[in-house]
Regions:
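Compositionally biased, charged N-terminal/linker segments
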Residues: 1-44, 138-140
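Structured loops at beta-to-helix junctions and adjacent beta-edge loops in soluble globular domains
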Residues: 7-9, 89, 123
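Short, acidic Gly/Pro/Ser/Thr-rich loop/turn segments
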Residues: 11-13, 93, 130
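Short, charged beta-turn/beta-strand-edge "cap" motif at the junction between a beta-strand
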Residues: 52-58
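Aromatic- and Lys/Arg-enriched surface recognition patch
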Residues: 61-120
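Charged phosphate-binding loop/patch that engages nucleotide di/tri-phosphates or the phosphate backbone
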Residues: 123-140
Length: 140
């Protein structure tokens, strides 16, 4: 299993929007960055990810599961762009803010800190466990 981070602006698509889609999930569409697209191509059904609110809140607020592998993005006719589908698993007990992540030296190399603008990012297993611990949330 691999771990990921999905960033979204709360005003565009927030955690509560994701939860309303249930186990069927929703396309993580609209990504127009080649590196982020390639990360989605690497994802497998069952992989887990952090749901991160960017902009105002800047915090990990939930855990999602990849429920459909990479496929053409339905928001464009351009075949270069693909997306995965994700479904909500559970909210974080305590949101983990970007400040908390940056303050933890163990997370200094995390993509969220190094490549903060990338909308889809890999997360190592160690980073996954640390962030879940900071949020008092079960990593499984």
């Amino acid at each position: 299993m691999a771990y990921w981070l999905f960033k979204s602006e709360l005003s565009v698509w927030g955690w509560n929007d994701q939860v309303t889609k249930g186990d069927v999930g929703e396309e993580w569409d609209g990504v127009r960055n080649y590196q982020a697209r390639n990360f989605m191509r690497d994802m497998a059904v069952g992989d887990l990810g952090f749901f991160y609110h960017s902009q105002k809140e800047k915090a990990v607020v939930g855990i999602v599961r990849v429920c459909a592998a990479a496929h053409p993005d339905s928001t464009t006719d351009d075949p270069r762009w693909e997306c995965v589908d994700i479904s909500a698993v559970r909210p974080f007990t305590v949101p983990v803010t970007l400040e908390m992540v940056k303050a933890d030296e163990r997370l200094a190399d995390m993509a969220l800190v190094r490549s903060s603008r990338l909308s889809v990012q890999p997360v190592t297993e160690t980073e996954w466990e640390i962030v879940c611990g900071l949020g008092n949330t079960d990593p499984e």
